[in-house]
Amino acid sequence: MSDNDELQQIAHLRREYTRGGLRRHDLPAEPLPLFERWLRQACDAKLADPTAMVVATVDERGQPYQRIVLLKHYDEKGLVFYTNLGSRKAHQIENNPQVSLLFPWHMLERQVMVIGKAERLSTLEVVKYFHSRPRDSQIGAWVSKQSSRISARGILESKFLELKQKFQQGEVPLPSFWGGFRVSIEQMEFWQGGEHRLHDRFLYQRDSGAWKIDRLAP
């Protein structure tokens, strides 16, 4: 059998999920403490990029798009990420702020999905975070007109060296086209893999100022 033939056998790739379950008595009254516990466990397990999350948006035709970004802050007000404001996702959020986030912690047989509304961060919040980044990352933010078409990587590298020279003295200024978003938590779903595909799913949903918790069928 050729390598290509083996690749075509993906329908037979499967495994049992045996790392544990999630029961109602394990659940706090609000979702954030459980999210924080799972995130801490993902970090402690040395997962690659435990703060990586998929951000799903839609364009004006209803076409969905997904990409991975890094979570940079979270609290009761929502989950925060930063991006180029000229990017496709930023334009789509401007037209439709309803987004979905997904944390795929495969090695722990866990997923967390968030549904909420994205809102722009204040300039003060963005400036504070921007200047906490490594200096080369600050310069890199100036280089790319995100999602635009370019003919070669060399264009980016040349621009980076040019701007590194330009900003060699003093602080790198915040680009006017760079910012961040906070995604409110309207729903948060926790998924824990289970044996025989009997996975555990619990959905937290805001209900008149409180949190309603439902178990969902896998």
From Swiss-Prot:
Which Pfam families does the record match to this protein? PNP_phzG_C (PF10590), PNPOx_N (PF01243)
Note describing how the cofactor binds: Binds 1 FMN per subunit.
Specify which residues bind FMN according to the UniProt entry for this protein. Answer: 67-72, 82-83, 88-89, 111, 146-147, 191, 201
**What are the UniProt keywords, alphabetically?**
Flavoprotein, FMN, Oxidoreductase, Pyridoxine biosynthesis
GO molecular function terms listed in the Swiss-Prot or TrEMBL record:
FMN binding; pyridoxamine phosphate oxidase activity
The biological processes this protein is annotated with in GO are:
pyridoxine biosynthetic process
Provide the E.C. number(s) assigned to this enzyme: 1.4.3.5
Which SUPFAM superfamilies would you find in this protein's record?
FMN-binding split barrel (SSF50475)
Which named protein is this?
Pyridoxine/pyridoxamine 5'-phosphate oxidase
Upper lineage: Bacteria, Pseudomonadati, Pseudomonadota, Gammaproteobacteria, Enterobacterales
